[in-house]
């Protein structure tokens, strides 16, 4: 995680975690490097390199104080993001706990001025299906899951189906997906003839959103 520093520690923030904050800071704010300060430490699950994190944020121009945007609160929920330690998001949220509020200061570059982010860690999301296991269907591929939920597939042999066939391996109890919804999903595609995977969100390192 990025270190705390003079710039991030100078930001004043009022409001509850999970609600858009009131933020004040000296303008223009001098930011020399990426910094983060934990304003409030939540008592939830800690974030690690495998976590899918639901979060909300407010962003400001560090030179003028103008608000750049507020997302993730109320109706403007963001899709969860996978935390990679080497990414800017990972450097800000890494090792934080659910329920925490952090402030991050980003230095300017050739394309943009410095920025100030107030970020709330709302929750972590499972990285694989967690629903109730269903009985296998005869004639369908056999799917085995490892301890992280990543599948391996054994084909049943014989000719491939001539039309789409679907069997449910785990049945969830969450909200029903409706037309127009945006979803976040893991997938694993395998060749019927060889059983070898030709594409997978696990091999890509992040879920697919659509």
At which residue positions do the language-model features occur?
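Cross-family detector of peptidyl-prolyl cis-trans isomerase
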Residues: 1-210
């Amino acid at each position: 995680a990025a270190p705390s520093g003079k710039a991030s520690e100078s930001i004043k923030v009022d409001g509850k975690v999970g609600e858009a904050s009131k933020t004040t800071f000296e303008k223009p704010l001098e930011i020399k490097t990426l910094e983060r300060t934990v304003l409030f430490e939540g008592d939830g699950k800690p974030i690690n390199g495998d976590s899918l994190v639901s979060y909300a944020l407010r962003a400001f121009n560090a030179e003028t104080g103008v608000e750049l945007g507020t997302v993730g609160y109320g109706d403007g929920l963001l899709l969860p993001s996978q935390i990679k330690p080497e990414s800017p998001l990972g450097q800000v949220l890494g090792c934080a706990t659910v329920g925490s509020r952090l402030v991050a200061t980003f230095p300017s570059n050739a394309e943009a001025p410095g920025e100030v982010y107030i970020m709330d860690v709302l929750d972590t999301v499972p990285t694989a299906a967690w629903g109730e296991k269903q009985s296998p269907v005869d004639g369908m591929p056999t799917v085995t899951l490892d301890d992280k939920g990543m599948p391996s597939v054994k084909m049943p042999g014989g000719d491939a189906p001539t039309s789409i066939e679907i069997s449910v391996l785990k049945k969830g109890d969450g909200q029903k997906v409706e037309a127009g919804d945006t979803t976040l999903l893991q997938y694993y595609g395998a060749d019927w003839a060889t059983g070898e995977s030709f594409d997978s969100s696990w091999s890509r390192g992040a879920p697919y959103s659509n």
